[in-house]
Amino acid sequence: MGRGKIVIRRIDNSTSRQVTFSKRRNGIFKKAKELAILCDAEVGLMIFSSTGRLYEYSSTSMKSVIDRYGKSKDEQQAVANPNSELKFWQREAASLRQQLHNLQENHRQLMGEDLSGLNVKELQSLENQLEISLRSVRTKKDHVLIDEIHELNRKGSLVHQENMELYKKISLIRQENAELYKKIYETEGPSEVNRDSPTPYNFAVIEKTNVPVQLGLSTLPQHSDAEQSTAPKLGLQLNP
């Protein structure tokens, strides 16, 4: 058998009434949520129980829904009555002018102007605002400086790594040159290396048996005064 038709009237039993209220409340909240999601609607729902307890649901925020409702209702009334519409926009313009005046006055006071009409309490409030603003500015400045320092440290680390890599490459090149020179020295002999090497001084060894060894500068054959004055040759001279 199907369910019988429920008569819509107040439930006298308090327990049954509370159970029905809880079930119906959850159901209507579920429907409101589905409506907001499926139809992209802004939904606001408020329910007061018989005991005065508030239950509410809003797809955005209840305050924005109520504000939108009040504004929409005023606009509808203004459209219905041209005189009311004119008064509405006049009030809006006056309110905006007042807000602009307040902002300009507050700005001048923050800049230290137009302070003659303020009492001690108002001056203290203005001082507190300035201190809060100054702390915010200093905090932001500190954060910016810290970020810049971190960035400079990062760049410094990169430069240091690049220098280390360059130093390793230079050391490797020097090692390769030393090995290459050693191979040439072993292949061609000391005489070939000394003859080909562009050293500014030449070492000569003169040997005689049973003769004391003395070190000195040996003079190469004299060709001309110009040649003799340029590039003296370093030699090992054995004198009798």
UniProtKB/Swiss-Prot annotation:
Q: Which keywords are on file for this protein?
A: DNA-binding, Nucleus, Transcription, Transcription regulation
Region Disordered: which residues?
Answer: 220-240
Q: Which Pfam families match?
A: K-box, SRF-TF
Q: In which tissues is it expressed?
A: Ubiquitous.
Where in the numbering of this chain does the K-box domain appear? 86-176
- Which PROSITE patterns did the record assign? K_BOX, MADS_BOX_1, MADS_BOX_2
Q: Polar residues: which segments have biased composition?
A: 220-231
Record-level GO cellular component terms: nucleus
Q: Which CDD domains match?
A: MADS_MEF2_like
For this entry, list what GO says about its biological process.
positive regulation of transcription by RNA polymerase II; regulation of transcription by RNA polymerase II
Any one Gene Ontology MF annotation carried by this entry is:
RNA polymerase II cis-regulatory region sequence-specific DNA binding
Domain MADS-box per the UniProt entry, residue ranges: 1-61
List localization entries. Answer: Nucleus
Q: What role does it play?
A: Probable transcription factor.
PANTHER family, alphabetized: SERUM RESPONSE FACTOR HOMOLOG
Protein name, per record = MADS-box transcription factor 27
